[in-house]
Curated annotation (Swiss-Prot):
InterPro entries: DNA-dir_RNA_pol_bsu_external_1, DNA-dir_RNA_pol_su2, DNA-dir_RNAP_su2_dom, DNA-dir_RNAP_su2_hyb_sf, RNA_pol_bsu_bac, RNA_pol_bsu_CS, RNA_pol_bsu_protrusion, RNA_pol_Rpb2_2. Keywords: DNA-directed RNA polymerase, Nucleotidyltransferase, Transcription, Transferase. Belongs to the RNA polymerase beta chain family. SUPFAM superfamilies: beta and beta-prime subunits of DNA dependent RNA-polymerase. This is DNA-directed RNA polymerase subunit beta.
Length: 1372
């Protein structure tokens, strides 16, 4: 049935929101490549194995090669892993091949001697659930995606901060995924240095020489040459080259050869003149003799007669050198082109500084810098240098790094080339030199084109590689120690290093986090989170303001609002609603393509780098009927700046206004009217909302509620078109069409979660929303999850709110709330606490779980069964026994009396202590579940047998329901064929003499439904029909057998016992459901960052009320709005009020019996939507009545962020509902009945109850544990600690002169051990004297001084009297 919902959004979004968990799920699927049958892609797990294998021994006589891997089926399903505290994992088997070679000692050639192939068990790998989580040791965890600096190349400068001269120093860094970092940087003298792996720097030309380049090669690559001729007459001639223009003055008149003068002597040579010189065909121009001085030679100058090197390349040219060269008969000088253009001599200067003569010396020098301890040979140095950047074993740029390198340096290399080439390095230096000489802008390291996401698959892949590399070393050692020809592959491979690395990563890594499971939104948000922290990332202390700040490239990719408030602000962020992560790990956002000012239906996803040159219009830009941009100039984004651009220049357009925010922020209506700080709080606090007893979706929503609820995994969704065969509170069975689940006849059973404990102890339960016989299509909601109503997120309640002060009870954001809210359980939530007790085998004997506990009265045992375990349904309070347990005490020497007692009463009085599991303070609730885990070989107690019988009966019923649904589905498939066909035999009924159908009668649908499925065999006259029925029944039998196998294995698991840790005999887990009603001290919040604590729960009759007698539900402080600047809450209040009143009025019309035509017209008039009008016209009267009846609590409205209801829309609704246009109402005081002096802003606001509940925080102690060292009470509720009396409290008591009270606080109530004992004795005796001793903290201070070599002793002066005793009760 269509829901009557008012949508205020004006922009038609053409793209559905991508599945919110795609990033996690797709990444792990890509890592595992589980379904691939043929050769898998060289990535993920396959890529890791291929990168480490083949493993050869040191003599190359044997090689261990990887063939393939297979992922098996997990031993336990997900619910079992959670209940038993296990990891949800699957076994991995790898097929490897051991090849043994014969090596010819003379030639070194290898010939294969033997090949052994074997499949080996290679440990287990945690599997991801369909919700994107991992179950590790029984708890659901999330691997958070890491946002880190992308591999590739980056050019930076220091903004003049490094050197005192304030000179801007440029640098360049090539970052691989794995291998040595390469840094090039200039110093203040413009010398270019290189660092490898952040070691000592050296002149960069050493690296070029090590690559095999000579001095001349280096100069030729980086500089152009210009030539000068030395005239015998002493003139200096400059050879004209078209691209060598320099703005110098002419030394002599430059003539064109036809008698004309191009440039007169002393005049500057302009670009026009240079063009005329080139066109005139002049080969040389005479220049001043000193022009060449200070330039540098481009080549070695060799005496042609003797072969002597007169001057070397890069030498500076001086007047004397020119004279010597002229005398030696040198007529033409090649010179580096460095003057006048953006080409400095820095590289030539570096070359002069570099003293290494050739490649060998350069490689040895690099080896010496990186390995200073070991003296190298040229061969070792050459091999070491080759392995630095050119070997795939030691260096991996990764496809991302190669992509970024290609993009930045303008190279066209394949992304499969993952090592660094000489050309890459040389091009990088050329770009760096150009940047330095032209003072170009550096790359922005915070730009999302330079930051990439490492999803879960890649993180696990890296860990797997670390484990495999450790294993590789062990395999090589084994190969060299043993005779390989006698070994099998399994003798070499030990998967334990891999298992250890994975266990450490999933259990303790900073990125493997305990899932935030407070509600469905918090789950989804946690999986969409990006963290800049973690291994290989930033640290909180080092991260500066720039990396935390919002960047222009974040638009549509990272939410500018949702981030934590504390020290992690800006380091932990969220993906936006439409964002996707591409194969390279860069975040992409979708845009509609615009051509010549007209919108197209094409959509393309762009990462931040590829968006650079585009002109992007906003989603709300006006578009005419032809799909063209209506305005000639539109607001657009160009390279991060917002400009007014001509419509013909616009190339792209945003998909939706909500694409710039995350899902949490997109759930805040009127977000555009809230201050960003409060919006941040609002989006964070929605994640803390506790699922309530009854969920209620917001009257004022944004349209995102359905997407979040459906994608969260908390709901059960139909997987395709089908029919609901069975539905109750615990199970739904659906038969699907379209070939889904062929092995079970298209029938799928869904078990609903009931009273499931979440990670945050909130109660997760699912409720069916479908009924038997209902026809469903793909994506329909079959069952709602916690905090979800009708497939939409429903985290709070719609309350009638008034903004007014009330006797100071809403001072400082406090909240005044009506008792009705508590009485009707509006904000009541259920929380589930789990307690566990383990019976171990101790040195003194086994612990025992029993009802027979010494020194415990029958009253304490009243709720325990015969096995000593509490019964389900019992109400418990603090200190009640949940599971009785006794532990053997150490045998002591017995007195004759004890021996006599033991002889008389037998073993009853044996030495055992009571170690029963008791309810801790602050917990009061009902036992909802008890699980007993026994060893497989152990004896089962009565409670275990009862649980097994109950579970077996449940499984039997499930099997029967499933088989029945299978039969119903079969009847539906056969009905079209069988109905109307003649029956061959008479069918008897159940009662004697009853006949269902005579022979020859036609088959009817009623008869078909009444007959058992098996009875259809051989029933019809037509042979063809019988054969078709027989074929269908064969399939049916096969499917029933398949189901029987599934249920038999479940029955077997119930009775087979459990794998318990060593030394554990039995384990019992008890779940208590605690009902938490709304209480004074509970934290509540709206969606706009408006939070507060309940200060008073006021009787309903005392609350402010309307003129018709209805009281408000909640009173908020109006002063909480202006300074916080979250005006969205006021707009939500007004729109909610209009929606509630209009819905109530329509429902009243229905109740008063208004004509259907009138009611339909009224509904259309209220909604004013063509879609709703069409829906209303299509509904029959009964469906329409139900739809209008649902509006009784208010019309559900959707106002998307940045595209929501305008002020005019809200006022028109308020006026349509017959209320005052300013949204204010006259209220009356509930205590006196008087009218309040001012009219009050009232309306409906969506309020959440947050998980900061007072019942979980309030704590009191009279006696309890003490610290061993200081003898002071411990701190905190978890330790059952005391209340700290700090120095400020001491000052307060001193100010009041309460000396005896203070003495009591600081001694007997704190750490005076002897005084405590004496106090206890005095209370027992009724004596009221305070006798304070020495506080233990004084002894600690004395010992501290002793450790510093100071001895402190106490001396009493002669003749001094001791102080008089004073009664401590009288001191009060």
């Amino acid at each position: 049935m269509g829901q009557l919902t008012k949508k205020f959004g004006k922009i038609d979004v053409s793209l559905p929101i991508p599945h919110l968990l795609n990033l996690q799920v797709d990444s792990y699927v890509k890592f595992l490549q589980e379904g691939a049958t043929e050769r898998r892609h060289d990535e993920g797990l396959e890529g890791v194995f291929r990168s480490v294998f083949p493993i050869e021994d040191f003599n190359r006589t044997a090689s261990l090669e990887f063939v393939s891997y297979e992922v098996g089926e997990p031993k336990y399903d997900q619910p079992e892993c959670i209940s038993k505290g296990l990891t949800y994992e699957a076994p991995i088997r790898i097929k490897v091949r051991l090849v043994v070679y014969d090596v010819d000692e003379d030639s070194g050639n290898r010939t294969i001697r033997d090949i052994k192939e074997q499949e080996i068990y290679f440990g287990t790998l945690p599997l991801m659930t369909e919700k994107g989580t991992f179950i590790i040791n029984g708890t659901e965890r999330v691997i958070v995606n890491q946002l880190q600096r992308s591999p590739g190349i980056i050019f930076e400068h220091d903004s003049g901060k490094t050197h005192s001269s304030r000179k801007v120093l440029y640098s360049c860094r090539i970052i691989p995924m794995r291998g040595s970092w390469l840094d090039f940087d200039f110093d203040h003298k413009d010398i270019l240095y290189v660092r490898i792996d952040r070691r000592r720097k050296m002149p960069a030309t050493i690296l070029f020489k090590a690559m095999g380049m000579s001095k001349t090669d280096i100069l030729d690559y980086f500089y152009k040459k210009e030539f000068y001729r030395l005239d015998p007459m002493g003139r200096l001639m400059w050879e004209v080259q078209k691209d060598m223009y320099r703005k110098d003055s002419a030394f002599v008149d430059i003539e064109d050869g036809k008698g004309g003068t191009i440039v007169k002597a002393g005049k500057p040579i302009t670009k026009r003149a240079w063009r005329l010189i080139s066109e005139a065909g002049l080969e040389t121009i005479e220049v001043a003799p000193d022009t060449i001085e200070g330039m540098f030679l481009a080549e070695d100058i060799v005496n042609p007669a003797t072969g002597e090197v007169l001057a070397e390349a890069a030498d500076e040219i001086t007047a004397s050198l020119v004279e010597n060269l002229r005398e030696a008969g040198i007529s033409r000088l090649p010179v580096l082109h460095t003057k006048g253009l953006e080409t400095s001599s820095s590289l030539r200067d570096t070359l002069v500084l570099d003293k290494t003569p050739d490649m060998e010396a350069a490689q040895v020098e690099i080896y010496r810098r990186l390995r200073p301890s070991s003296p190298p040979t040229p061969e070792i140095a050459a091999s070491f240098f080759d392995n630095l950047f050119r070997s795939a074993d030691y260096y991996d740029l990764s496809p991302v790094g190669r992509y970024k390198l290609n993009q930045r340096l303008g190279i066209d290399q394949s992304v499969d080339l993952r090592t660094l080439t000489d050309d890459d390095i040389l091009r990088a230096i050329r770009v760096l030199l150009h940047l330095k000489d032209s003072h170009g802008p550096a790359d922005d390291i915070d730009h999302l084109g330079n930051r990439r996401v490492r999803p879960v698959g890649e993180l696990v892949e890296n860990q797997y590689r670390i484990g495999l590399v450790r294993m590789e070393r062990a395999i090589k050692e084994r190969m060299s120690l043993q005779e390989v020809s006698t070994l099998m592959p399994h003798d070499l491979i030990n998967p334990k290093p891999v298992a250890a690395v994975l266990k450490e990563f999933f259990g303790t890594s900073q990125l493997s986090q305990f899932m935030d499971q407070t509600n469905a939104l918090s789950e989804v948000t946690h999986k969409r989170r990006l963290s800049a922290l973690g291994p290989g990332g930033l640290t909180r202390e080092r991260a500066g303001f720039e990396v935390r700040d919002v960047h222009t490239s974040h638009y549509g990719r990272i939410c500018p609002i949702e981030t934590p408030e504390g020290p992690n602000i800006g380091l932990i962020v969220s993906l936006t609603t439409y964002a996707k992560v591409n194969d390279f790990g860069f975040i992409e956002t979708p845009y509609r393509i615009i051509r010549e000012g007209a919108l197209t239906d094409e959509i393309k996803f762009l990462d931040a780098s590829r968006e650079q040159g585009e002109v992007v219009a906003q989603a709300n830009a006006a578009v005419d009927a032809d799909g063209k941009l209506a305005d000639e100039y539109v607001t657009a984004r160009v390279r991060g700046d917002v400009l007014m651009s001509h419509r013909d220049e616009v190339t792209l357009m945003d998909i939706s206004p909500s694409q710039m925010v995350s899902i949490s922020a997109a759930l805040i209506p009127f977000l555009e009217h809230d201050d960003a700080n409060r919006a941040l709080m609002g989006s964070n606090m929605q994640r803390q909302a506790v699922p309530l007893l009854r969920s209620e979706k917001p009257i004022v929503g944004t349209g995102m509620e359905g997407d979040v609820a459906r994608d969260s995994g908390a709901c059960i969704l139909a997987e395709g078109p089908g029919i609901v065969r069975y539905a109750d509170a615990t199970r739904i069975i659906v038969s699907y069409e379209n070939g889904l689940y062929p092995d079970r006849g298209g029938v799928r059973a869904y078990d609903l979660q009931k009273y499931h404990k979440s990670n945050q102890n909130s109660c997760f339960g699912q409720r069916p929303t479908c009924h038997p016989g209902q026809i469903v299509k793909k994506g329909d909601v079959l069952a709602d999850g916690p905090g979800i109503e009708d497939g939409e997120l429903a985290l709070g309640k719609n309350l009638v709110v008034a903004f007014m002060p009330w006797c100071g009870y809403n001072f400082e954001d406090s909240i005044l709330i009506s008792e009705r809210v508590v009485k009707e359980d509006v904000f009541t939530s259920i929380h589930i606490e789990e307690f566990e007790v383990v019976a171990r085998d101790t040195k003194l004997g086994p612990e025992e779980i029993t009802r027979d506990i010494p020194n415990v009265g029958e009253d304490m045992l009243r709720n325990l069964d015969g096995s000593g375990i509490i019964r389900i349904g019992a109400s418990v309070k603090p200190d009640d026994i949940l599971v009785g347990k006794i532990t053997p005490k150490g045998e002591t020497q017995l007195t004759p009396e004890e021996k006599l007692l033991r002889a008389i009463f037998g073993d009853k009085a044996r030495d055992v202590k009571n170690t029963s599991l008791k309810v801790p303070p602050g917990i009061e609730g009902t036992i909802i579940d008890v699980k007993v885990f026994n060893r497989r070989s152990g004896e089962k107690d009565e409670r275990t047998r009862n649980i097994e019988d109950y579970e077996t009966a449940r499984i039997d019923k499930k099997e029967q329901d499933h088989v029945r649904a299978l039969g119903d589905a079969l009847r539906d498939r056969l009905a079209d064929t069988l109905v109307g066909k003649q029956i061959a035999v008479t069918l008897p009924g159940k009662r004697k003499g009853e006949v269902l159908a005579e022979a020859g009668a036609p088959m009817t649908r009623e008869l078909l439904d009444a007959l058992p499925v098996k009875r259809l065999a051989g029933l019809f006259k037509s042979r063809e029909v019988d054969e078709m029925v027989d074929t269908a029944l064969e399939d049916y039998d096969r499917q029933v057998a398949f189901l029987k196998g599934i249920y038999d294995s479940k029955r077997e698991k119930v009775t087979e016992g459990d794998d318990l840790p060593p030394g554990v005999i039995k384990m019992v887990k008890v779940h208590i459901a605690v009902k938490r009603k709304l209480n004074v001290g509970d934290k509540m919040a709206g969606r706009h960052g408006n939070k507060g604590v309940v200060s008073c729960i006021l009787p309903e009759e005392d609350m402010p009320f309307f003129a018709d007698g209805r009281p408000v539900d909640i009173v908020l402080n109006p002063l909480g709005v202006p300074s916080r600047m979250n005006i969205g809450q006021i707009m939500e209040t007004h729109l909610g009020w209009g929606a509630k009143e209009l819905g109530r009025q329509l429902a009243e019309m229905l109740d008063s019996g208004a004509a259907m035509a009138t009611l339909r017209h009224e509904v259309k008039d209220v909604f004013r939507s063509a879609t709703i009008a069409k829906l209303v016209d299509e509904m029959d009267d009964e469906t329409f009545r139900k739809a209008v009846s649902k509006l009784r609590t208010g019309i559900v409205t959707k106002t998307p962020v940045f595209d929501g209801a305008s002020e005019e829309d809200i006022w028109s609704w308020i006026e349509r509902a017959g209320m005052d246009g300013d949204g204010k109402t006259v209220l009356y005081d509930g205590r006196t009945g008087d009218k309040f002096y001012n009219r009050v802003t009232t309306g409906v606001m969506y309020i959440l109850k947050l998980h900061h509940l007072v019942d979980e925080k309030i704590h009191a102690r009279s006696t309890g544990p003490y610290s061993l060292v200081t003898q002071q009470p411990l701190g905190g509720k978890a330790q059952f600690g005391g209340q700290r009396l700090g120095e400020m409290e001491v000052w307060a008591l001193e100010a009041y002169g309460a000396s005896y009270l203070l003495q009591e606080f600081l001694t007997v109530k704190s750490d005076d051990v002897t005084g405590r004992v004496k106090m206890y004795e005095k209370i027992v005796k009724g004596d009221n004297f305070l006798e304070a001793g020495l506080p233990e903290s004084f002894n600690v201070l004395v010992k501290e001084l002793m450790s510093l070599g100071l001895n402190v002793t106490l001396h009493q002066e002669e003749g001094k009297k001791r102080p008089k005793r004073v009664g401590f009760m009288s001191a009060l």
